Amino acid sequence: MTKSSIMRQRAEEFSSLIEEKAMDEEHLVRIVLNFDDLTPTDEKTGIPSDLQKHIPGHLLFPYEDAGMATGAYLAATSLHFRLEESPDALRRAKKAFHAICHIYELGKKGCCEGFFPKPYGGKFSTHTSRDQYLFAMSGLFEYYQIASKPEQEKIRHMLAKMAEHWRTINYSLSYFSLKKQCQLCDYIAPMFLGIACLPSRLEHSPECTKETERLIFSEKLGEKAVDTLTARFRRGETYDGACYFRQNENPLMMKSLAMEHLWNAMPAHRDLCRVTLENLASDELFLELSTQDGLNYYIMRYNPDADSLELTPPGRIPELTNPLNLSFMTWGGDRRRAGSTQSVFAAIIAASYLNDPELARKAEHILWQLTPDKFRGIFCSSPEHIPPGYEYMERVLYCNYICYWLWDYYLGKSRKLW
């Protein structure tokens, strides 16, 4: 078999796995399964209840990023159908669309229209996050291209209400024990540019355009977009109390996705998008990559003397802030996982708009490296590199990263990058 046919077969196997094993009865994508038998997690999996004690860990964690995973799967299957008109892809996309609508209705009934909750245990919760919104909204946008007229009308309404919700709450929220605070001040705040402008990709929306302009200039999200962690550290600044890259592939994916929407919704800001993507590609893309296996290191320290990243010994890193007191957030060592799927997404966006074929080739190579066995929850050289209480990571399959792999693969194909 050729490399191309192997990748295509892998994509079909991944798509089938998500549909048949990871989706629950409402077609929400659980972000983890038991690795050995691909069954839903249970008490025996050993996931700690470290965020909300009254919800068992095996019900809470699989749904922590279910909105993101389902949105990514919706985008991937929609792109797949547009490319090949596959009946299987259309069926899967419709299931994922149902799931996103289900979460939307949970928020509407439990709080207000436009609130998109984290559906712990498949049910309503008072918690959400901006990345859930951006992924779900992006999935809806891709599905819109293949949706029926009634579905398209529903999607336009949902996107408008979801963007409006953030304006209504002044981009502020609380999360478990964390106090309510504005989300516009940190490094990943530029993702809101994607949320704010996305409805205007489907219909004329002076309100969304005006709000996006306000965020760019008055809230200085334009300045934040072109900045990078590397640049901050070179200026002698810190982030989260120190100079570490900690799961930085997530901000990279969010920022590049926001630039994707801004580029197309508001062409006047393409220079901002271009500089943002150039800085992302030159300063941060693939810094955390383990080239031997295509996985990303979870946490790495910036060394100002060498102007490079380095691993730290296993153990708690006291200088890093950890307001939720989660050991995995500040535990050093050489643990790795398939977060590189998010780095690849950012590379695809950058390669598309910067016309960089070498970046596209590197992205494709990483996808090639990520064989099915690479989606285990954690890889490390010895047990002491596993954060205390998180031994279960060796026993789970990360389905969200499989969904991101699929989105990467079909997005790259749709842009003729491979």
Predicted regions and their residues:
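Inter-helical turn/loop segments and adjacent helix faces that build the functional surface
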Residues: 80-87, 143-156, 202-207
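Short glycine/serine- and small hydrophobic-enriched flexible loop segments
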Residues: 75-83, 138-145, 194-201, 260-264
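Carbohydrate-binding/catalytic loop surfaces
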Residues: 27-62, 109-129, 174-193, 231-264, ...
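Non-membrane alpha-helical segments in proteins
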Residues: 62, 68-82, 122, 135-139
